[in-house]
Amino acid sequence: MKILIADDSSTVRRLVAARLSADGYQVLEAADGAEAVELARSGRPDLLVLDKVMPKMDGFEVVRALREDPRTASVPIVMLTERTSEQDVLGGLGLGVEEYMPKPFSPLELSLRVRRLLARAAP
């Protein structure tokens, strides 16, 4: 299974990629929102781990773009971000984000949430 990690922090991308690679997933990485949309459309990931605050397009703009595209509309999304106000959480969930996790985060908890979402999305 393939997972796209979109975060402008290379440290966060490395941490998440290391955890998910150790779980046996193939990992794609994007450093900004526009790259995330492009990779989601071309790379066809099974799940996206997405930061809210990124250059070029923020996480909510990425979610909107992916949900409007039939090729990516059903890809599960985990929002992993420091932006955890009630307004941010409700905004993300309202756009179709399946999980909303605050930073700092537990890589093991992220791993479990990813596994659960992928199991639910499996045919």
Residue ranges and their predicted role:
Residues G43-V49:
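Active-site beta3 strand of CheY-like receiver
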Residues M54:
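Receiver (REC) domain active-site loop signature in two-component systems and cognate sites
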Residues G24-A31, L39:
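Short hydrophobic/Thr-rich beta-strand motif most characteristic of the beta2 strand and flanking loop
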Residues F105-R115:
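C-terminal output helix
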Residues R14-A22:
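Charged docking surfaces used in two-component/phosphorelay signaling
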